């Protein structure tokens, strides 16, 4: 009996060790109220701690912090990926296939203007994925994606 319990504990420790860790990302915004509405009402993120010049958000289990920078000026640059002009820099989350589909529908219903509309990228190739891009009200570019086979996230 003790051996069984110890085996389960070791297995749990291994699983916890290999689970992805949440990231923390702080981004500049020029108008905190406008961006707070976007991240909470449009993206559906839950707000955490806040002050008059920053707000924490739960972005699919990751900590995103909006920090006021009244002089924030986004330099827009694009690189070609799969024949599309991808905004750089950008950030986002890799979702499950079904979660991506419902999130893309939510964004469409909320009237988000896509830089790159949801589409299947690298079809039939390693790393096949659904992806979409849009800007938040401060001009920060976001990408959300879902891999057909999550084992191919780093496939080449």
Please annotate each region the language model reported.
Residues 28-72:
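Core segments of cupin and vicinal oxygen chelate
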Residues 21-23, 53, 62, 87-89, ...:
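A generic structural signal for short beta-strands and their flanking turns/coil linkers
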Residues 18, 22-30, 58, 78-156:
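Vicinal oxygen chelate
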Residues 9, 14-33, 90-91, 95, ...:
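N-terminal beta-strand motif that seeds the catalytic metal site of vicinal oxygen chelate
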Residues 65-66, 72-76, 150-153:
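A short local loop/turn or secondary-structure capping micro-motif enriched for an aromatic residue
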């Amino acid at each position: 009996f003790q051996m069984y319990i110890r085996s389960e504990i070791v297995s749990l420790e291994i699983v916890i060790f290999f689970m992805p860790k949440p990231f923390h990302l702080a981004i500049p915004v020029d108008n905190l109220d406008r961006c707070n509405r976007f991240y909470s009402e449009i993206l559906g993120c839950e707000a955490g701690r806040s002050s008059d010049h920053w707000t924490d958000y739960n972005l699919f289990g990751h900590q995103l912090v909006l920090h006021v920078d009244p002089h924030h000026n986004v330099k827009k640059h694009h690189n070609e990926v799969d024949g599309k002009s991808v905004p750089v820099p950008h950030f986002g989350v890799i979702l499950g296939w079904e979660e991506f589909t419902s999130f893309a529908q939510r964004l469409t219903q909320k009237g988000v203007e896509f830089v790159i509309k949801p589409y299947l990228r690298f079809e039939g190739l390693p790393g096949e994925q659904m992806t979409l891009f849009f800007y938040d009200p401060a001009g920060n570019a976001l990408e959300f994606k879902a891999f057909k086979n999550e084992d191919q996230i780093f496939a080449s």
